[in-house]
Amino acid sequence: MEYRRVKDQESYDVVSQKDIESPGERSLSSTSATSSLSTAGASKGKNSWKLKSIVTLALTLLTSSQAILIVWSKRAGKYEYSVTTANFSVEALKCLLSLIALYRTWNSQGVTEDNRLSTSFDEVSVYPIPAILYMVKNLLQYYIFAYVDAPAYQILKNLNIISTGVLYRIILKKKLSEIQWAAFILLCAGCTTAQLNPSSDHVLQTPIQGWVMAIVMALLSGFAGVYTEAIIKKRPSRNINVQNFWLYIFGMLFNLVAICVQDFDAVMNKGFFHGYSFITVLMILNHALSGIAVSMVMKYADNIVKVYSTSVAMLLTAVVSVFLFGFHLSLAFFLGSTVVSVSVYLHSVGKPQPQK
Amino acid sequence: MEYRRVKDQESYDVVSQKDIESPGERSLSSTSATSSLSTAGASKGKNSWKLKSIVTLALTLLTSSQAILIVWSKRAGKYEYSVTTANFSVEALKCLLSLIALYRTWNSQGVTEDNRLSTSFDEVSVYPIPAILYMVKNLLQYYIFAYVDAPAYQILKNLNIISTGVLYRIILKKKLSEIQWAAFILLCAGCTTAQLNPSSDHVLQTPIQGWVMAIVMALLSGFAGVYTEAIIKKRPSRNINVQNFWLYIFGMLFNLVAICVQDFDAVMNKGFFHGYSFITVLMILNHALSGIAVSMVMKYADNIVKVYSTSVAMLLTAVVSVFLFGFHLSLAFFLGSTVVSVSVYLHSVGKPQPQK
């Protein structure tokens, strides 16, 4: 009971924090990940399954520790820093790590057609699109709270799962088997069940405007994810760090706009890094690494794996919070976790015959 | 919210009413069902699927109207009659309907080895076993409430779903595919989710004795159901009405014992039918017909179909109650219903290759 109450307050912050950060929710390889990445380019057939597992595990662990860090930072006191500068820092850090990884690749393999930074207008012209989609979604987020309260918004966010599945099918033209579709519906129902709390029923009183906005936001978010996958997969031999560099450049650009619009005065008067603590730095580092993991998952797996990974992370966070913060798990959480587990199982056994 | 509160009080009564009635939860053919039954014996191969669907639908509709009748009778006032005499009446009515159906069969087909009432000791000796199992379970029911409250008991009752599946596999040696097992776990989780209410979390505080008793009760109930199926299916050509007649004779016998133990004085002083109203008669009729439907499902389908049927009936009851009694459905109900629906779908697509 206590767990859910605190979690709801927290997860709203996770939402605002995470969603505004989303333009850069793609990746680059951190120094430690670089080597596996660059070798993977060479012998990718053999290592593909291994790589897929590693990036999925990394995303799951990073996403779950992300929520825990936010709870921890909240317990330590209120946010003193401006969220927009933190998001910009995340983008900048990812951009920097991309360049470091690229530099190492250039040193070991030399500059090739696939790993050189310079690009054509045709190639780069699609890169701002995900960032624009996330920006529109973040704008809508300010308006939806006129119709929906924060816990109800948490529930409605699970529509993302369905929209990602549908757009993945339509845009990337990849097939899911009937059992995998059933598993996807279960994933959505299971995640929502795990998040149920005594005030969840409010969501049923959501007015039609709220529903429309929630659905539009889910579509925008799903579209941005699927579009990013399409960009990254369009040229499989292209170095992921170059692709990320260009994605993050636009992420920085759009976050710069956000700083100017929202926090211009605060940054001018108090400075860019005002209120940053050790935990703020940890959170920025975690977000940057999570971004890397998301991008890796997009390159070596797909959006479906990403959705499963972040859903399992949500459950992991709750379980870890029991030990770290003494939260209590509800019966709904156990039931939702059971449904999510069965969904993961069904997704893996329900592969369509000529998979991928 | 209101729905769930009222439903919990009611469904506890459903429990006590239904469980004590259970020894006779098998069937005979009502006059209208008789013809389809007797013809089915002849051309059973062709009509098997049709018959299976009809009996399943009948069971679903009768079970859902059963709970509605109980809510209705409660609204009309408290039970004035003794539950044990009502249960005895249900058994007696089913016994009578069995005999009527048999009489019609004898007239049309003559007395054969398969439809004659007389039996060997070997054949009849197994018939009291389900009744004994239900009696032990009903005895346990009086003690479990020392450890578990009524809403928590409602939640724990869903263990029946799992125990039925496991015992069905072990005793009847029938195979479920992996996907069907997954579907069965989902059915249990979905039904429990649909019944969640703000006080459901109490169940997590159930002491170990409560868990043990709940599991033993689930096993007894599952065993009784599976054993009944084994008895009925042992001799497929045997007329179902003869099989039911002997089951119900023992049902009457054990209910007679229950009357003597619980309500002897009341029956002696006020009479057997004291407090019976029009709705009491309707309920007895409904219980008798539900018993018929369960028995038909055992003969022409199986325990798994029975569990699905009664689970869907539980959801139907809730939806119908919205219109009849102005109940409100919770978000948990929608989520649980979604999971149950997906489970039904998975059970049907997940058939093992050489099914049955």
Swiss-Prot record, chains A, B:
Residue spans of biased composition, Low complexity class: 27-44
Membrane disposition: Multi-pass membrane protein
Domain of life: Eukaryota
Amino acid composition bias (Basic and acidic residues), ranges on this chain: 1-24
MF terms (GO), sorted A to Z: pyrimidine nucleotide-sugar transmembrane transporter activity; transmembrane transporter activity
Cell location: Golgi apparatus membrane
Segments on the Cytoplasmic side according to the record's topology features: 1-52, 104-125, 173-175, 233-239, 299-314
Tissue expr: Expressed in roots, leaves and stalks.
Main location: Golgi
Annotated GO CC locations: Golgi membrane
Chain ranges passing through the membrane: 53-73, 83-103, 126-146, 150-172, 176-196, 212-232, 240-260, 278-298, 315-335
Ranges where the record places region Disordered: 1-44
UniProt cross-references to InterPro entries, sorted A to Z: Nuc_sug_transpt
The keyword Transport is assigned to this record: yes
Parts of the chain on the Lumenal side: 74-82, 147-149, 197-211, 261-277, 336-356
GO BP terms: transmembrane transport
Keyword line: Golgi apparatus, Membrane, Sugar transport, Transmembrane, Transmembrane helix, Transport
Function: Sugar transporter involved in the transport of CMP-sialic acid from the cytoplasm into the Golgi. May transport important nucleotide sugars such as CMP-Kdo (2-keto-3-deoxy-D-manno-octulosonic acid) in physiological conditions.
Assigned protein family: Belongs to the nucleotide-sugar transporter family. CMP-Sialate:CMP antiporter (TC 2.A.7.12) subfamily.
PANTHER family: NUCLEOTIDE-SUGAR TRANSMEMBRANE TRANSPORTER
Protein name: CMP-sialic acid transporter 2
Originating organism: Oryza sativa subsp. japonica
Gene: CSTLP2
